[in-house]
């Protein structure tokens, strides 16, 4: 008798996606981050929903409503910190997921990769708007600085900024629209994730060797469900340790001060997961140039498939490319560190060198090294 999961239209869909899905037999733990991102998204939507029940999106009450959630709402403190630190965990998983895609050549699955880039940008926009909602000093000034970048757009810039603000400065209308967008975007992210999976299942998963695996596939369940559950437990352990022992470790102390338009914090900076892009923005002396560099730091991912010159998909057997890859990873860590430092010597110079190295590695060095490796293969 045929199991119900193979007959029922709805269960058949779930079955083909998560149970009987043919999966390469050799995919490593690096492939766990996709399912972890799904878990993060569920956690963020759930905790966010409960926070939205008690939050007040008005400049006069937003800060005190956060204090009310933390102090008076039953288990409000853990919901709040799970949401804040869950965002950090989501970005850790996201960066590792993108990093794995770069290393193993998953970017050659163009539809999946491009929807992934849209997902990354949407998630970054959602997180930025969420950072504004507590209406602390860093929320207010972060919103002012980042939204003000739109004024760099020629001709329509100033009008665009005032349209986003809902007035002549960041105030209640800005907060209300940011809350509205922050609430709706995770559901758009969920829809995009479904598309991401749809295109992934059209081609099938990549694998560490970067070769076709049609002759050697196994079902997703029970093998990879078990493997993913182990990853999920380790992820939850890390999240709970962070939330229960150091809930404010990744936050900014300035955000515990009510937003004040008359006092500027000594050092305005976004959340840690935006610092690499923030450094690139600061490294360009020109405002419009900085905004373009900021956008290109993410959109550069879209040109990586075009710049792929190697005869091999994966970097597994390309030692020179591996060296460049880890140089790029280290460079991103340096950019993140510099973003948290004040705008003074030597941090400005280090930031500029790291920014140039970031673009040079991706646009010039990686394609050249791949061509050299191709020649070395011919000589072998």
Curated annotation (Swiss-Prot):
PROSITE patterns: CYTB_CTER, CYTB_NTER
Protein's recorded name: Cytochrome b
Cofactor(s) the record lists: heme b
Keyword Ribonucleoprotein annotated: no
Note, other: Heme 1 (or BL or b562) is low-potential and absorbs at about 562 nm, and heme 2 (or BH or b566) is high-potential and absorbs at about 566 nm.
Lineage: Eukaryota, Metazoa, Chordata, Craniata, Vertebrata
Complexes and interactors: The cytochrome bc1 complex contains 11 subunits: 3 respiratory subunits (MT-CYB, CYC1 and UQCRFS1), 2 core proteins (UQCRC1 and UQCRC2) and 6 low-molecular weight proteins (UQCRH/QCR6, UQCRB/QCR7, UQCRQ/QCR8, UQCR10/QCR9, UQCR11/QCR10 and a cleavage product of UQCRFS1). This cytochrome bc1 complex then forms a dimer.
Transmembrane segments: 33-53, 77-98, 113-133, 178-198, 226-246, 288-308, 320-340, 347-367
InterPro entries, per database record: Cyt_b/b6_C, Cyt_b/b6_C_sf, Cyt_b/b6_N, Cytb/b6-like_sf, Cytochrome_b, Cytochrome_b_C_euk/bac, Cytochrome_b_N_euk/bac, Di-haem_cyt_TM
Protein task: Component of the ubiquinol-cytochrome c reductase complex (complex III or cytochrome b-c1 complex) that is part of the mitochondrial respiratory chain. The b-c1 complex mediates electron transfer from ubiquinol to cytochrome c. Contributes to the generation of a proton gradient across the mitochondrial membrane that is then used for ATP synthesis.
Main localization category: mitochondrion
Membrane-protein topology: Multi-pass membrane protein
């Amino acid at each position: 008798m045929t199991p119900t999961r193979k007959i029922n239209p709805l269960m058949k869909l779930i079955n083909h996606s998560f149970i009987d899905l043919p999966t390469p037999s050799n995919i490593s733990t690096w492939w766990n981050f996709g399912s972890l991102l799904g878990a993060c998204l569920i956690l963020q939507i759930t905790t966010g929903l409960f926070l939205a029940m008690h939050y007040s999106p008005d400049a006069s009450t937003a800060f005190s409503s956060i204090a009310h959630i933390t102090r008076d709402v039953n288990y409000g403190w853990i919901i709040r910190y799970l949401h804040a630190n869950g965002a950090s965990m989501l970005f850790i998983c996201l960066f590792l997921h993108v990093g794995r895609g770069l290393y193993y050549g998953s970017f050659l699955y163009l539809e999946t990769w491009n929807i992934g880039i849209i997902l990354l940008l949407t998630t970054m926009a959602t997180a930025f708007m969420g950072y504004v909602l507590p209406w602390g000093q860093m929320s207010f000034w972060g919103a002012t600085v980042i939204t003000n970048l739109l004024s760099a757009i020629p001709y329509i810039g100033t009008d665009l900024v005032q349209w986003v603000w809902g007035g002549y400065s960041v105030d209640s209308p800005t907060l209300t629209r940011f809350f509205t967008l922050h609430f709706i975007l995770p559901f758009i992210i969920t829809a995009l994730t479904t598309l991401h999976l749809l295109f992934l299942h059209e081609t099938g998963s990549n694998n560490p060797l970067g070769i076709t695996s049609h002759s050697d596939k196994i079902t997703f369940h029970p093998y990879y469900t078990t493997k993913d559950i182990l990853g999920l437990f380790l992820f939850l352990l890390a999240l709970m340790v962070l939330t229960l022992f150091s809930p404010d470790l990744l936050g900014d102390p300035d955000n515990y001060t009510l937003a004040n338009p008359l006092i500027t914090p000594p050092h305005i900076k976004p959340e840690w997961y935006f610092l690499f892009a923030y450094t690139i923005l600061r490294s360009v002396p020109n405002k419009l140039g900085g905004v373009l560099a900021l956008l290109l730091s993410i959109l550069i991912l879209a040109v990586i498939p075009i710049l792929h010159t190697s005869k091999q998909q994966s970097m597994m057997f390309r030692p020179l490319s591996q060296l460049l890859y880890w140089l790029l990873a280290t460079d991103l860590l340096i950019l993140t560190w510099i973003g948290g430092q004040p705008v003074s010597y030597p941090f400005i110079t280090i930031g500029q060198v790291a920014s140039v190295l970031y673009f040079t590695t991706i646009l010039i060095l990686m394609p050249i090294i791949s061509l050299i490796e191709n020649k070395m293969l011919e000589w072998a």
